Amino acid sequence: MNLIVCHLGGGVSVGAHQKGRVVDVCNVKDEGSMGMDRAGGLPVNQLINYCFSGKTKDEVKRTFGRRAGMFSYLGTTDFRVVCAKVVEGDPKAVEAYQALVYQLAKDIGAMAAVLHFDVDAIVYTAGMAYEDFFCDDITAYVGKIAPIIRLPGEEEMRSLAEGALRVLRGQQEAGQY
């Protein structure tokens, strides 16, 4: 089975899963879509200028790692607040929201290419996947690639703990990433 998994939480990532293995991923810490408080991919020349603007390394990391993304536009990392502003028609919120949807759609398309467009499903996970219209807006771009599966919720820590337990019990080997 080949999947594109879109983790839509505080951090955002879009991964290509080919027959049970992650073969590529766009992750908000380094590239791809912005997240709620992370910048995602940035224009290199502007980034270089910012890094040499007198800011310390810690200031630059804090800006792009905790004060960027949707937070830099709307002053919040709460996606429910962002969605409420979008529904109210707040122009700044609508513009930032549309940029997020567009960036995610591009990342999903890129991961489809990685899988040679042999995609069994696109999966939306984590807290932002609770928002129907958000998922619908992304799907408007990518829905022709593969069926959509929504698994909203915050199960990351439980999944990590269960995986560690399987390794400790000898039921699974620890992976190297």
Question: Would you name each region that the model predicts?
Answer:
Residues 2-3, 11, 19, 23-79:
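Glycine-rich phosphate-binding loop plus the immediately following alpha-helix
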Residues 4-9, 125:
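Short beta-strand segments
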Residues 44-52, 58-65, 80-83, 105, ...:
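Predominant activation on well-ordered alpha-helical scaffold segments within soluble catalytic domains
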Residues 129-130, 136, 147-177:
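Glycine-rich phosphate-binding/hydrolytic loop that grips phosphoryl groups
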Residues 62-117:
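Adenine-nucleotide phosphate-binding core of ATP-dependent small-molecule kinases
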Residues 119-138:
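Glycine-rich phosphate-binding loops at beta-strand->alpha-helix junctions
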